[in-house]
Amino acid sequence: IGDEQSQFVHLNTVNNEWEPDNSRRQRHVSLAIVYNLWIYSQLTEDESILTDGGLDLIIETTKFWLNKAELGDDGRYHIDGVMGPDEYHEAYPGQEGGICDNAYTNLMLTWQLNWLTELSEKGFEIPKELLEKAQKVRKKLYLDIDENGVIAQYAKYFELKEVDFAAYEAKYGDIHRIDRLMKAEGISPDEYQVAKQADTLMLIYNLGHLGMLVGY
């Protein structure tokens, strides 16, 4: 019998202190798995993978996401309490519990719901109630977009402070783990516009050929 081995803390090697690890909030991993399933089916033209468990995977992960999406007073669906691919942002400044409306998560979910719709149109059996809710959610997931048309990494991201990278480089030299340097200084990367992994930019790589879901 196994026991729980999920990582809940990790070591900051700058100050040698154990810090909370909230990477379990990166629910977007399920979207990437479905996306890879789609890539496989497109490259091989082998749809037997869908009838051999693939469709079940799509349906069950869709159930999870539709349950997590909540309709707001603005008429848009919002997904809260998650982390995007960028591990430097675990929550809003001074808060806990993840961030809201991560662009990567919301647009990848929109893509998944679109594919679910396409599969239904091709004759694959999708539960009626699931499909009906997918139609509502896929066109109304919220994105935070500024006046210049730039997509924010997540809701209120552009309200975060900017980082003086030159100052950090002058002080430390190697800043590839600037998050640990910040935490050792007693501040949090959650407060700043700084990223570890490609997050919003990953959308362009994944969905650029689809016009970033124009009119999503």
Give the positions of each predicted feature.
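Active-site core of glycosidic bond-cleaving carbohydrate-active enzymes
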Residues: Y35, D52, N106-T110, N114, ...
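Short conserved active-site loop signatures built around small residues
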Residues: L55
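Conserved functional hotspot residues or short segments at active or partner-binding sites
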Residues: I58
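The feature captures the catalytic groove of carbohydrate-active enzymes
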Residues: G2-D52, F64-K139
